[in-house]
Amino acid sequence: MGLVIKLVRHCESEANTGKVNAHEVGDHAIPLSPHGQGHAREVGRALGREYVAGSLLYASPYKRTRETLSGILEGCGLTLDDVAGSYEDPRLREVEHGYEPIESQAELRRTHGWFYYRFRGGESPADCYDRTSSFLESMMRQVERKDTERVLIVTHGLAVRCFVMRFLHLSVEQFDSLANPHNGAIITLADKTTLVDPIFTNDYWGVSGLTLRVGDE
């Protein structure tokens, strides 16, 4: 079947529900909501015990991604000792939004481009792309050393899109067209002939599980 990479956006967090403000508690410390905890177990069952057990697992070190991975393993009836390998990597962290309201920067983002605009005191998607590219190179070396064809990455919505952009060599315009995946969404990169309705493809690879943006969402 060849290499299969599944990326999961963390499940619903307390910031997604509006109960927690990242500026007050620290973005890295935001936990999953009770609904998100249950959803993570459902995601694990959807991925399947066989896939997860045979995978190299990578996760952002943020609390909500750690808890999502824990839920996935619980849903499969597995522990970290049961998988091919497990790693936390700070390069998979959420894009740093800085310390000013995102909404107040919307016009600047439109003017300078969604991909290029750097949040005040934070990062741009282009910055996230650079570190995600570095992660991908490290990951592929580990895949070769471990002699495995399955990878599971638990991360954040923008990091998912940057990873897909780098892996498929998408243009900036194609990146800008991608909607942020839903919480708990499973995105698959694999041989395009094995995927149902891939949204983007190249000569060999395709991606499924992503959708296109509508307006300025």
List where the protein language model places each region.
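Domain-wide signal for the mature, well-folded portions of proteins, strongly enriched
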Residues: 5-7, 19-21, 38-41, 45-50, ...
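GST-like fold's C-terminal all-alpha helical module
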Residues: 128-145, 149-157
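Short active-site segment of divalent metal-dependent hydrolases/proteases
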Residues: 13, 159-160
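Acidic, low-complexity terminal tails and accessory targeting/binding regions
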Residues: 1-4, 49, 78, 88, ...
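Active-site-proximal alpha-helix that buttresses catalytic centers in soluble enzyme cores
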Residues: 2-80, 123-127, 132
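Phosphate-handling substructures
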Residues: 14-15, 30-31, 73-134, 200-201
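Active-site signature of alpha/beta-hydrolase-fold catalytic machinery across serine-
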Residues: 71, 162-166
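Short glycine-rich phosphate-binding loop at a beta-alpha junction
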Residues: 53-61, 87, 150-154
